[in-house]
């Protein structure tokens, strides 16, 4: 199980690297999906199933919609793939900066791969992440509304930025 969790962590980092290496938006979407699936699978394997489900729905429901609209409205005649020299250069540069930062920060020798879960202890039947469901819906309502409004605003900003000189999503009535 520990190897599976480490594999999901590696997939999460590689997905983030695939988005950060600035390929064409077509390939950036694939990296975003890989990172979100691996990150939510990582949380799921650690026992945080509700938070994993909420984050997965936010990632794929919000951020992926913005990527899909930007890809459909800004088509590249010659998209950059992950094998192009510039994209590989960015990827190698990010990995080198990460490795130098770990060596300089002293994290290399102190990495501990112990994995713990958030399961309930003893005879308790309620897991720890399910006790936070009430907090999501009672105290977190305002934050959900702010996050939803931010995603909607981001969608309209991206649509306005990629529309060019033609009529876009927001028109004067």
Curated annotation (Swiss-Prot):
Segments passing through the bilayer: 1-21, 27-47, 48-68, 87-107, 139-159
Keywords: Electron transport, Membrane, Mitochondrion, NAD, Respiratory chain, Translocase, Transmembrane, Transmembrane helix, Transport, Ubiquinone
Domain of life: Eukaryota
Entry keyword annotation includes Mitochondrion: yes
Coiled coil: none
Top-level EC class: translocase
Signal peptide region: none
Gene Ontology molecular function: NADH dehydrogenase (ubiquinone) activity
EC annotation from Swiss-Prot or TrEMBL: 7.1.1.2
Subcellular localization: Mitochondrion membrane
Disulfide pairings: none
Membrane topology according to the record: Multi-pass membrane protein
Gene Ontology CC: one annotated term: mitochondrial membrane
The reaction(s) this protein catalyses: a ubiquinone + NADH + 5 H(+)(in) = a ubiquinol + NAD(+) + 4 H(+)(out)
Major location category of this protein: mitochondrion
Pfam family membership, one: Oxidored_q3
UniProt similarity note: Belongs to the complex I subunit 6 family.
PANTHER family: NADH UBIQUINONE OXIDOREDUCTASE SUBUNIT ND6, NADH-UBIQUINONE OXIDOREDUCTASE CHAIN 6
Reported function: Core subunit of the mitochondrial membrane respiratory chain NADH dehydrogenase (Complex I) that is believed to belong to the minimal assembly required for catalysis. Complex I functions in the transfer of electrons from NADH to the respiratory chain. The immediate electron acceptor for the enzyme is believed to be ubiquinone.
Name by which UniProt lists this protein: NADH-ubiquinone oxidoreductase chain 6
Biological classification of the source: Eukaryota, Metazoa, Chordata, Craniata, Vertebrata
